[in-house]
Design a protein with these regions (language model features):
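Membrane-interface helix-loop-helix modules in multi-pass membrane proteins
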Residues: 1-50, 181, 185-199, 203-247, ...
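Membrane-helix interface residues
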Residues: 18, 62, 121-122, 131
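Helix-loop-helix module between adjacent transmembrane segments
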Residues: 22-119, 188-193, 205, 276-283
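Hydrophobic alpha-helical segments and their helix-loop junctions in multi-pass secondary transporters
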Residues: 40, 79-87, 91-106, 110, ...
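Helix-boundary and loop/linker segments of multi-pass membrane transporters
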Residues: 59-64, 174-180, 259-265
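Small-residue-rich segments of transmembrane alpha-helices in multi-pass membrane proteins
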Residues: 59-64, 134-148, 223-227
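Membrane-embedded transport cores of multi-pass solute transporters
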Residues: 132-133, 139-140, 272, 276
């Protein structure tokens, strides 16, 4: 969930596709459910046999070294576009938010360098803790920006959706004539994304380092994190009718556009005050 897609692709889908973007909430809430059954078994076998990769697990299960090699190659090829997408997204964010003071390429290299350093020095557990801090930070940023842009551009959620319905009623529907997505495609997007969710090689690697109990707890709690994506989608909806289509090269640029054109000093102060602990406010 917590990736550059959340801040670029998520708002972009809401801005350009409307209600079709809600499939993201569905697959994030349901994607890990199969791991409730699979995960604990993977964890136990991984600790017992000292597995490191997904290929180790499958190769041992089917007694095939050839399968280990194939899984390794497929995993590597699958990670290349995934990692490239993340690094490109960070490079773009650095470039836009620094008003070209950091170039696209330098921003991507900076993001890659930070990741390489903390993974190389801290290992798997260090990467896991970085995920925790990243999630907390992104939750805060997402809710602050989501609430701010809705209130500053429309006054309230009700006003925002009323304006969208008034200008384009089918934009908030699924499967109707004129809507951005058919019911079949919407459903298939959810199913395919759910299946893909539990096929990532790093899901196996992380399961080897934890316990069956923690895996089950994580699976049960994980749907709550879909709440994080609500304000992300609100950002995209808030931009409808505000950001001209020809102002963007592609829909994924909508959040950087809003930040650079509609985030004022008062908006930054609003974000800070929103998250000051209440005891300090009381004093």
């Amino acid at each position: 969930i917590f990736s550059t897609f959340a801040f670029l692709g998520g708002p972009g889908w809401a801005y350009s596709k409307g209600a079709a973007s809600l499939y993201i909430l569905a697959y994030c809430a349901l994607g890990l459910m199969p791991w409730y059954i699979i995960g604990p078994k993977v964890a136990r076998l991984g600790k017992k046999s000292n597995y490191i990769t997904m290929g180790d697990f499958l190769g041992d299960r089917y007694n095939s070294k050839f399968l280990v090699i194939i899984i390794g190659i497929v995993s590597l090829l699958a990670f290349i576009p995934y990692l490239t997408l993340q690094i490109k997204g960070m490079g773009y964010i650095f470039n836009v938010l620094t008003f070209d003071n950091i170039s696209y390429n330098n921003g991507a290299l900076l993001a890659l360098g930070v990741v390489v350093i903390y993974v190389a020095t801290s290992g798997v557990r260090g990467a896991a803790w970085s995920d925790v801090f990243q999630a907390i930070l992104m939750l805060i940023v997402a809710w602050v920006l989501g609430i701010y842009f809705v209130e500053s551009l429309h006054g309230s959620l009700g006003n925002m959706f009323s304006k969208i319905i008034e200008d384009n009623p089918d934009f908030l529907t699924i499967g109707n004539e004129g809507s951005k997505i058919s019911s079949a495609r919407y459903s298939s997007n959810i199913v395919v994304s759910m299946l893909g969710f539990v096929m990532w090689p790093h899901l196996f690697t992380k399961s080897y380092t934890t316990t069956a109990r923690r895996i089950k707890l994580t699976v049960l709690v994980y749907p709550i994190f879909a709440i994080f994506l609500l304000p992300v989608l609100f950002i995209g909806f808030a931009a409808i009718g505000v950001v001209p289509n020809d102002a963007l090269g592609r829909p994924g640029e909508v959040l950087p556009y809003l930040i650079t054109h509609h985030l004022t000093e008062s908006g930054i102060l609003y974000g800070i005050v929103t998250f000051i602990p209440s005891p300090f406010l009381g004093n």
